[in-house]
């Protein structure tokens, strides 16, 4: 009798409809859930609701991903990409098919696996140079730190302002931008004048090294630098001559105070 009952569950799942189908989406038996995918009454909304469950097996998630009528749906692709049990290969495949701002959604989801969030960011960053300015501005305002940083580094005036105000932007990302060999002057100037970033000690050290940091900012930052950092900056071969002059003046001032 138990065997008949066990067989009845998957069999019922293959043909259920209406309220019964809705109820089976919450079934705990893995075989029943796999059988549901064979049910012709399963629509996109049913599969989307099923994928909201965090206890689904990798086998079931892979079965959904293999089905053309499901993996062509953006809603289902998002859910597969962000699900913690989706095999990585499958999740990455789904990510590559997502629209730009769906990638942003995945990249910002704390519940999505960390490596999938990073992969989503990488895909967005790769698209940034080719995007229209309107989308760049939206990414500057709402994108995760790496994405906002990529837009910031592009140097568009409006994007620079928005990216520096982005709540996800981190000091680490600002420092990576300032470490780039090539960087538009307006980006350096904007960071040096920004009320949040220009007061960060490590950002000030990085700005002192840049050729486009305005002299007034340079003169403001130098007295706050630790002696060791000031000496390190003075020893940089690529330091601009005008900056070197002010650094040496600051070193001389401190030496005179010691005497």
Label every PLM stretch briefly:
Residues 1-259:
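Alpha-helical scaffold segments
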């Amino acid at each position: 009798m138990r065997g008949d009952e066990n067989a009845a569950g998957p069999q019922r799942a293959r043909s259920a409809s209406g309220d019964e189908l809705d109820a089976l989406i919450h079934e705990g038996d893995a075989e029943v859930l796999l059988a549901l995918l064979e049910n012709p009454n399963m629509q996109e909304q049913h599969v989307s609701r099923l994928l909201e469950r965090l206890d689904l097996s990798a086998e079931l998630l892979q079965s959904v991903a293999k089905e053309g009528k499901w993996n062509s749906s953006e809603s289902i692709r998002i859910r597969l990409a962000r699900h913690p049990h989706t095999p990585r290969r499958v999740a990455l495949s789904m990510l590559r098919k997502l629209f730009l701002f769906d990638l942003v959604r995945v990249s910002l989801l704390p519940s999505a696996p960390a490596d999938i969030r990073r992969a989503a960011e990488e895909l967005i960053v790769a698209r940034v140079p080719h995007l229209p300015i309107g989308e760049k501005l939206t990414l500057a305002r709402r994108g995760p730190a790496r994405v906002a940083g990529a837009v910031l580094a592009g140097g568009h005036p409006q994007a620079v302002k928005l990216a520096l105000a982005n709540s996800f932007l981190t000091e680490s990302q600002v420092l990576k931008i300032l470490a780039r060999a090539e960087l538009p002057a307006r980006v350096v100037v904007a960071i040096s004048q920004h009320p949040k970033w220009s007061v960060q000690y490590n950002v000030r050290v990085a700005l002192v090294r840049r050729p486009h940091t305005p002299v007034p900012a340079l003169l403001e930052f130098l007295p706050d630098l630790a002696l060791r950092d000031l000496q390190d900056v003075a020893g940089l071969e690529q330091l601009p001559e005008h900056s070197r002059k002010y650094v040496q003046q600051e070193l001389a001032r401190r030496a005179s105070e010691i005497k």
